[in-house]
Amino acid sequence: MWLLYLILGSVESQLLPGNNHTTECNIPGNFMCSNGRCIPGGWQCDGNPDCFDESDEKECPRARSRCGPNFFPCTSGIHCIIARFQCNGFEDCPDGSDEENCTAHPLLCSNSRFHCKNHLCIDKSFVCDGQNNCLDNSDEEHCHSPQEPGSEQDYVSSENQLLYYPSITYTIIGSSVIFVLVVALLALVLHHQRKRNLMSLPVHRLQHPLLLSRLVVLDHPHHCRVTYNVNNGIQYMSGQGYQQPVSVESPPSYTEAVLDHSSRPPWFDLPPPPYPSDMESVSQTELPPYRSRTGSSASAGSTEHPRGTPCGTESPTEPQDPTAAPSDDLPSTEVDV
């Protein structure tokens, strides 16, 4: 008989799960949930619900808080959240203790917070942010319309929305200052470079002789004649028909020529040649030859070019203007080029 009862009891304990849980819960140190499931006793009141009905986190003594003055301690005593997250419509604590008994604390729903229509309180920064923080969408109503007088809802002011504007302003000002400094430095470098170029110009100019300014470059044709006339300066005549003479820069004045000792030839200070006697001057019908400073003698008329020169065509001397001032009747010299 006793053997039969023992067999029936073992079969019943294996077929009925409730009895199995009861057997496990009889072990010292285990906790039985409200649905009959057993969990280790160390999981009870640890801040994490292990039972499906969360009965292991109910009626737990509040642990000693280790949070700072600006934080809210969760019921488990392990987690801490920012104080302003308490009663904001979201369960920030794992056990949801931050959203319990919110309406029972009038200080948590003071005028500094937003009152939802379902009697929840959230922070002002969550109003009109595009999210349903009140769980009834009351924090997203009338976001683009002006606030009605006497309404209990407070909306985020423009000052709260512009919290980050000072940093943006400082960034723009700093960028502008850096840009101005870079432009000023670039302008200073260009000015210094230009000043150096201007200072180096006179050095190159002094390296050339001073007489280069008196040089005349002539584009000689195949047949040409150049006439040097003291009164009219230098005249250029082409052999291919008479062209209008080109007036070139006149020779230097007498004072400049006398003072310019470097351009004097060696025979400049020699005495003049002897003049012929009166009888010889009467018998001669031609003027005495004129000796130029270069040492070559020429007659009063134009000098013929020797054969083989590129300019063999003679050109008459340009007639003088009768209205011009009287000169010393110095002869002109024609030199073939």
From Swiss-Prot:
Cytoplasmic face residues: 191-337
Entry's Gene Ontology BP terms: vesicle-mediated transport
Family: Belongs to the LDLR family.
Transmembrane segments: 170-190
Name the record gives this protein: Low-density lipoprotein receptor class A domain-containing protein 3
Gene name as annotated: ldlrad3
Record topological domains on the Extracellular side: 14-169
GO CC terms of this entry: plasma membrane
